[in-house]
Design a protein with these regions (language model features):
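Transmembrane alpha-helix boundary signature
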Residues: 1, 25-40
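N-terminal transmembrane-helix/juxtamembrane module of multi-pass inner/ER membrane proteins
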Residues: 1-19
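Detector for Asparagine
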Residues: 3, 34-36, 93, 101
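Arginine residue identity/basic-tract feature
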Residues: 9-12, 31, 115
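Core segments of transmembrane alpha-helices
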Residues: 17-29, 74-80
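Membrane-embedded catalytic cores of phosphoryl/pyrophosphoryl-handling enzymes
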Residues: 41-147
């Protein structure tokens, strides 16, 4: 790695693969605990699975093109939280969850804007990161997609 910010696209791939392995091990442990705890972790497992899927797709894209991983991460978190809000609105305080989602959307804008101001990514790289992260996490959480 030539720099802490990893500006070279090909240097990101080993790190992304390491993170995928780490997320997968965490998913395996939580899946085991979930079976023993009456499936209490199910929404969080779908959240974690969405993160794994996002990272795998981002790694494949990174082979040919640089994508904004910061935008992918913050928008994925926003999409997952929106999914949790939509599936469990009766359980949680709706106003509180909307406040959290509003804050996350503002953070998503700030992070994305900062990537553009720092000139570390192009507009299209940031937009692809946002769309990919948000849509995958929202889909996984909303439709209960996991292994």
């Amino acid at each position: 790695i030539s720099n802490f910010s990893i500006p070279k696209r090909k240097q990101r791939i080993p790190i992304l693969l390491l993170v995928i392995v780490y997320y997968s091990m965490t998913y395996y442990v939580f899946r085991h605990w979930n079976n023993n705890l009456f499936h209490l972790f199910e929404p969080f497992l779908t959240f974690l699975f969405g993160g794994i899927v996002s990272l795998v797709i981002a790694t494949i894209i990174t082979i040919k093109w640089k994508i904004s991983l910061h935008a992918l991460a913050i928008s994925g978190f926003s999409g997952g939280m929106l999914g949790l809000l939509l599936i469990s609105g009766e359980v949680y305080n709706l106003q509180e969850m909307m406040a959290y989602n509003t804050i996350l959307l503002l953070l998503m804008g700030l992070v994305s804007y900062s990537r553009l101001v720092l000139k570390t990514h192009t507009y299209s790289q940031v937009i692809v990161g946002i769309v990919l992260g948000f849509s995958i996490e929202l889909s996984c959480v909303l439709f209960h997609i996991s292994l």
